[in-house]
């Protein structure tokens, strides 16, 4: 007997599903309109439509910046705020989604702090980053995120940050590499950027794992014969290259928005494998250490490293690996790029450099003996230089959150932008830290200029968030600022002058997970005469 009725039933089910979905969306829209009306919310302006539907042409420009020479921030994003004359607007994403974009501190405060529970990282971020970082503090929400943050927080006490022995060794290694190329009264031109990445890698691995990878000396061929084969294999310059490739791929996945999965391939997979090998090396060391008695470990080391602490909580090697890679991303890349921009600005602004060097001499003398967390904080011009660098070049210039429920932003809607903006559950809000840090109505007409003096007597508020804010504020911000300040002091103590020898003009920005000087940091140093 022929089952002639089966296709008809199937077609009916399909129609019913479509009708149900449309009806559900209709009811959902009515509820959202009532929600928006209850809060007095109005629509913000929409960005001008692109030449192609769904913003395809804009996404193409984002992905083609290397070939076109356009700057993602200055040429593609900031002009949209300027065209509309507003600090909050709505744009259309690649898959047709309605995206809110803002550089208003009141809205950013609402997202990150006031209405924190209304917002989340979201599943897309996890899928964009998860191939490399797995499930960890930067890719999780809710109780899972709270768990990971709780594990990491104890490492970032003032006592631990003030333990600067590993930082001093990393400084000496960097200075040693610079001085090798010395010629007459000046060193040869050197690109500081890769050296700074190795400095932060060496310092971070000491801080997190209790042992430096010695990447600076290994890369320069200056490491001692006593370094083990495992050190040379697992901690070599190859990791730097692999991590850079992973960072670039993750950045491309962000630009592709909902089509992030298109950014993949054998080269990316190989880089991920290399980065994971690096992390797995340390996981195995930590698990081996954990197999010893706690008493024996206490006799061998003054305190547990963070990884050893994590190993007390879980013996799952995948979870440990994910936490390591997240910490390395924050501890290495963020600090290295802060230092890269700082040295670039100081080399190009010799008067500020001279003032800073004089203050360092007065405060710290010629050696590391008096450098502590407290003394670094007490040197005003040193802190002002770092604050100003992060204002102009926040290492994470653009970030976002996803609405976990229907919610509102306090301003940006209506004809004059004074009304609230209603945001639907699942909607993305991009917040532009770079743009907010350069708003002339906040910072003055010289907002684009490097002027550390502007920080004298100025208090930090929501106009300035280089380390984010609210409950998810960067745990390692004091660690990063201390590492950066320490190296600045030691370099300016060692070398009487630093001169810019790179390309003049507007600095080109490179975008991975963080923002870095695309052309490197090309300088030379004068040598101290006997």
Name each model feature, range by range.
Residues 2-147, 161-162, 166-180, 271-274, ...:
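N-terminal membrane-proximal hinge/A-helix region immediately C-terminal to the signal-anchor transmembrane segment
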Residues 121-127, 163-337:
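Cytochrome P450 heme-thiolate monooxygenase catalytic core
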Residues 395-398, 417, 425, 430-458:
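Conserved cytochrome P450 K-helix/beta-meander segment immediately N-terminal to the heme-binding cysteine loop
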């Amino acid at each position: 007997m022929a089952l002639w009725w089966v296709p008809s039933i199937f077609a009916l089910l399909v129609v019913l599903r479509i009708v149900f979905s449309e009806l559900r969306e209709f009811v959902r829209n009515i509820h959202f309109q009532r929600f928006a009306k209850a809060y007095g919310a109005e629509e913000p302006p929409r960005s001008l439509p692109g030449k192609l539907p769904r913003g395809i042409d804009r996404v193409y420009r984002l992905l083609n910046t290397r070939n076109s020479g356009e700057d993602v921030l200055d040429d593609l994003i900031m002009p949209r705020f300027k065209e509309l004359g507003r600090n909050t607007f709505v744009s259309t994403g690649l898959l047709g989604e309605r995206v809110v974009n803002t550089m208003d501190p009141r809205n950013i405060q609402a997202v990150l702090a006031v209405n924190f529970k209304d917002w989340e990282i979201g599943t897309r971020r996890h899928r964009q980053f998860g191939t490399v970082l797995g499930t960890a503090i930067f890719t999780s929400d809710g109780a899972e995120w709270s768990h990971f943050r709780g594990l990491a927080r104890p490492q970032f006490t003032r006592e631990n940050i003030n333990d600067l022995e590993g930082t001093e060794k990393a400084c000496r290694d960097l200075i040693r590499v610079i001085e090798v190329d010395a010629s007459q009264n000046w060193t040869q031109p050197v690109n500081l950027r890769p050296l700074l990445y190795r400095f932060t890698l060496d310092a971070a691995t000491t801080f997190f794992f209790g042992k430096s990878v010695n990447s600076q000396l290994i890369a320069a061929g200056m490491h001692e014969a006593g370094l083990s084969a495992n050190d040379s294999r697992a901690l070599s310059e190859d990791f730097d290259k692999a991590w850079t490739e992973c960072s670039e791929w993750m950045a491309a996945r962000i630009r592709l928005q909902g089509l992030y999965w298109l950014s993949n391939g054998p080269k990316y997979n190989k880089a991920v494998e290399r980065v994971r090998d690096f992390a797995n090396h340390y996981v195995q060391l930590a698990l081996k250490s954990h197999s010893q008695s706690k008493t024996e470990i206490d006799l061998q080391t003054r305190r547990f490293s963070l990884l050893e602490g994590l190993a007390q909580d879980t013996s799952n090697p995948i979870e440990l690996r994910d936490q390591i890679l997240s910490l390395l991303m924050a501890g290495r890349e963020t600090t290295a790029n802060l230092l890269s921009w700082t040295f670039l600005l100081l080399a190009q602004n010799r008067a500020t450099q001279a003032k800073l060097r004089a203050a360092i001499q007065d405060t710290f003398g010629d050696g590391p003996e008096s450098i502590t967390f407290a003394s670094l904080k007490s040197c005003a011009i040193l802190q002002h230089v770092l604050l100003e660098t992060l204002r102009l070049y926040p290492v994470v210039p653009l970030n976002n959150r996803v609405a976990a429920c229907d919610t509102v932003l306090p301003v940006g809607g209506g004809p004059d932008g004074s009304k609230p903006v209603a945001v639907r559950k699942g909607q993305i809000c991009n917040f532009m830290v770079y743009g907010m840090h350069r708003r002339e109505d906040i910072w003055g007409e010289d907002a684009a200029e490097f002027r550390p003096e502007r920080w004298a007597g100025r208090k930090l508020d929501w106009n300035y968030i280089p380390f984010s804010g609210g409950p998810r504020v960067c745990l390692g911000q004091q660690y990063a600022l201390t590492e950066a300040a320490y190296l600045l002091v030691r370099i300016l103590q060692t070398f009487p002058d630093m001169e810019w020898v790179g390309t003049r003009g507007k600095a080109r920005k490179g975008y991975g997970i963080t923002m870095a000087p695309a052309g490197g940091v090309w300088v030379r140093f004068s040598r101290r005469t006997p």
